[in-house]
């Protein structure tokens, strides 16, 4: 029986790529966010499977950015360990890391309020 590999899906824009000007097509125009390289390496060294989970397509420009900045990853927008019969539209992971997220804690009232007042971290600076 194979051992379960801890899997994390990490958003690209706003988490790995600074993305200071928002979407500008397929170009990756900014630098990596400070600490991204070290954080990804720490996850890799702790045994995590790292999936870059982004609305971007898996393009040569995206891979070139990751590789030229020595940003470790295993896959882009795919989990080869995805259970048979599951929807490939949402990649299975143990953790999702995104700059535009709300963590659901079982309280819908609190969650709706958090959604209505949400501001991405980049706009708080």
Regions found by a protein language model. Name each.
Residues 1-125:
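HAD-like aspartate-dependent phosphatase fold
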């Amino acid at each position: 029986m194979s051992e379960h590999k801890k899997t994390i899906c990490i958003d690209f824009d706003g988490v790995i790529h600074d993305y200071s000007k928002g979407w500008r097509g397929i170009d990756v125009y900014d630098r990596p966010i400070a600490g991204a390289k070290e954080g990804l390496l720490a996850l890799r060294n702790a045994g995590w499977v790292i999936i870059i989970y982004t609305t971007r397509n898996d393009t040569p420009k995206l891979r070139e950015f990751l590789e030229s900045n020595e940003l470790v990853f295993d896959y882009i927008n795919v989990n080869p360990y995805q259970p048979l019969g599951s929807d490939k539209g949402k990649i299975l992971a143990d953790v999702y890391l995104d700059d535009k997220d709300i963590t659901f804690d079982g309280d819908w009232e609190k969650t709706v309020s958090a959604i209505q007042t949400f501001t991405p971290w980049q706009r708080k600076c």
